[in-house]
Amino acid sequence: MTGRLWRGGMVFGGLMLLWGLASRSGIPHFLLPSPLAVAEALWVNRAYLGWHTLITLSEILGGLALGVTLGVTLALGMILSPRLQRWLMPLVLTSQAIPVFALAPLLVLWLGFGMSAKVAMAVLVIFFPVTSAFFDGLRRGNQEYLDLARSMNASFGAQLRHVRLMAALPALGSGLRMAAAVAPIGAIIGEWVGSAEGLGYVMLNANARLQTDICFAALFILVLLTLLLWLAVDTLLHRLIDWSPE
């Protein structure tokens, strides 16, 4: 953990150095504000940015909870019923073939400008990696353990609970890590399409007023939220699935 934090700090410091040098190379401030200008915008607008951060965070966490629940449920349903799999898999794939930006206006139209549309957008982005990873893990259970369970006359439910589920947990962990990384995308897209709250709204509003420092400040907060969410999920998975090399 310490080594990972050290490497992350080195990368962050390098990016800050490159950013600072680029901002002093003659690029206009309204195109690329300096790191100090962004830090000042973060401090001066801390109450304003803090409120909108809470809105976006609640949308992300709501979408993550519902998206993971939906993904796990779909994967279990498809592994339990091959017929259901034949019907659901094309629908799951179709949901990812449609661009997220194309669905955002429709969700805002159907669900309104409140939080529901943003959470629904986050669910659409999140559920697929969870479904795909968990279903693949369930399907690739250790054949030797499955044969041993069958030789002991274990029922399908017992095989699923004691063999397939345990073997699929690392794959589910990979899906959860991916979901944590992409969770903010759906919420931000929903805020861009139609919202008066959240970091996506802050970025659009600041961009329209050429307040690039505030736009960068909101983007910095969003990146920080994503990294912290991913680290929280990764740390939790390492504690819960400590027997897995992954």
Language-model segments: which ranges?
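Transmembrane-helix boundary motif in ABC transporter permease subunits
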Residues: 62-92
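N-terminal signal-anchor transmembrane alpha helix
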Residues: 2-26
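Glycine-rich helix-loop "coupling/hinge" segments at transmembrane-helix boundaries
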Residues: 109, 185-222, 243-246
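Transmembrane alpha-helices
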Residues: 120-124, 157-190, 221-222, 233
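C-terminal transmembrane helix and the adjacent membrane-cytosol boundary/short C-terminal tail
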Residues: 82, 139, 170, 174, ...
